[in-house]
């Protein structure tokens, strides 16, 4: 175990000098020995010659000074894995931060690992029912798939993710890992108590590196959560991996890249953006032993989906749920855009011909309404043909029927949440498109579950 000395400290970047014959490898973890700051860990990022390595601090570098001794552990950061992590809150290093004592793990894994080989990977077409009408209809999720929730600031990414956790994780017999990457500490706290109240805390491992943490923590915390999920998958379990927020992972990479002195690329992002995203996403996969179904929130800067960060994420996903500010402005929640959201599972060979036809029918009606909006704005409804008037009326009902009350928003709305089965969703939209409910007022469709609820509501209007 070689030792070196700190020769330079610039914020989160620390240079350590070792003997020429015992220079640590890239990604090795170094421990700083100091009476006041004994727990600080550094991760080697670059070897810059003459025995000097440039590292990123996995914690606050306050009180760090030149001359302190750094011990090379000879391996990457290792974190606890296995049953002992369930019900616990950990930081990037796998240390408990819930004041419930040591984790007492039997096994630890390094956070840098190779993704499964092609031979080991497995595809799945089994659908995961979420109980959210617009998702189950337009962009169905696959068990073992990768799902992204895209949206700008304040359109409901976290609320949608919490609802999916509520509907899937609580009913799901497997295990869940929740990774908070650069988001609000309050949300992590709320999540912990929600899981506790639901009695499923013993099935969830939580790893947090929130927005007040240094960039090193935020860059590596996603890998820590993923490593815990991989262990469960390799044991033959089905795991749900929630990551909130992938954009903060990219942003932490940008900060680290700038601190290391790399030249920025497009829009100021790090030149290694695609590679860093690939390193994380390629490991989130299912094997013949078990599956990882991942749901990731992706912040979209300035609502621009062509920004390099969300654009790089798109390539890795099986289903994309796009949240729209325009739909949120109309007061229609969940503000999921049915014309922008996609899924590889929406294929007649996977979901069946009926489901496919209904979903495409809904999109066709909404697309036609979108095209007619300009004419309506200029000339008014009276100038439309009878067919177009009918299309507009149905489209407005479809828009409203795509809304539903959420369990997690019950405290704000006062309306109890509803889980809508796929069968009820298909029945409702099929009837709507065929004209069965043309005489029902459009207000009746707002915030209802199945079509039977709409008919009941219409009777009271």
Curated annotation (Swiss-Prot):
Provide the gene name from the record.
Answer: atpD2
How does the record classify its membrane topology?
A: Peripheral membrane protein
Molecular function per GO: ATP binding; ATP hydrolysis activity; proton-transporting ATP synthase activity, rotational mechanism
Q: Which Pfam families match?
A: ATP-synt_ab, ATP-synt_ab_N, ATP-synt_VA_C
Q: List the disulfide bonds.
A: none
EC number(s) for this protein? 7.1.2.2
Keywords of the record, alphabetical order, are: ATP synthesis, ATP-binding, Cell inner membrane, Cell membrane, CF(1), Hydrogen ion transport, Ion transport, Membrane, Nucleotide-binding, Translocase, Transport
Q: What is this protein called?
A: ATP synthase subunit beta 2
């Amino acid at each position: 175990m070689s030792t070196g000395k700190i020769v330079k400290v610039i914020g989160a970047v620390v240079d350590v000098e070792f003997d020429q014959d015992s220079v640590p490898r890239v990604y090795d973890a170094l421990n700083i020995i100091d009476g006041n700051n004994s727990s600080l860990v550094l991760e080697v990022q670059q070897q810059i010659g003459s025995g000097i390595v440039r590292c990123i601090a996995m914690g606050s570098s306050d009180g760090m000074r030149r001359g302190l001794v750094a011990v090379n552990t000879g391996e990457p950061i290792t974190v606890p894995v296995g049953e002992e992590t369930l019900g616990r809150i950990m930081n990037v290093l796998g240390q408990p931060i819930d004041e419930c004592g040591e984790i007492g793990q039997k096994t630890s894994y390094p956070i840098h690992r190779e993704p499964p080989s092609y031979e080991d990977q497995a595809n799945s077409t089994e659908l995961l029912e979420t109980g959210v009408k617009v998702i189950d209809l337009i962009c169905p999720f696959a068990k073992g798939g990768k799902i992204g929730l895209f949206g700008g600031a304040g359109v409901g990414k976290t609320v949608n993710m919490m609802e999916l956790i509520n509907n899937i994780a609580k009913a799901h017999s497997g295990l869940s890992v929740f990774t908070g990457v650069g988001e609000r500490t309050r949300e992590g706290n709320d999540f912990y108590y929600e899981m506790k109240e639901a009695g499923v805390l013993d099935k969830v491992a939580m790893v947090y590196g929130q927005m007040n943490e240094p960039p090193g923590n935020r860059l590596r915390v996603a890998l820590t959560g993923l490593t815990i999920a991989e262990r469960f998958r390799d044991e033959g379990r089905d795991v749900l991996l929630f990551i909130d927020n992938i954009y903060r992972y990219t942003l932490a990479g940008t900060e680290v890249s700038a601190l290391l002195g790399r030249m920025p690329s497009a829009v100021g992002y790090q030149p290694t953006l695609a590679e860093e995203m690939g390193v994380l996403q390629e490991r989130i996969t299912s094997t013949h032993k078990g599956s990882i179904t991942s749901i990731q929130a992706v912040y979209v800067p300035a609502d621009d989906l062509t920004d390099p960060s969300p654009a790089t994420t798109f390539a890795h996903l099986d289903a994309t749920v796009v949240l729209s500010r325009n739909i949120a402005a109309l007061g229609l929640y969940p503000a999921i855009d049915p014309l922008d959201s996609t899924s590889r599972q929406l294929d007649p060979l996977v979901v069946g011909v009926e489901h496919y036809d209904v979903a495409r029918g809904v999109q066709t009606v909404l697309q036609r309404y979108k095209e007619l909006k300009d004419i309506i704005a200029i000339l008014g409804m009276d100038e439309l043909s009878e067919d177009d008037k009918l299309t507009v009326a149905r489209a407005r009902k479809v828009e409203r029927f795509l809304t539903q009350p959420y369990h997690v928003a019950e405290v704000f709305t006062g309306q109890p949440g509803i889980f809508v089965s796929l069968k009820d969703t298909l029945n409702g939209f099929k009837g709507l498109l065929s004209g069965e409910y043309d005489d029902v007022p459009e207000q009746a469709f707002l915030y209802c579950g199945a079509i039977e609820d709409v008919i009941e509501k219409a009777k009271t209007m």
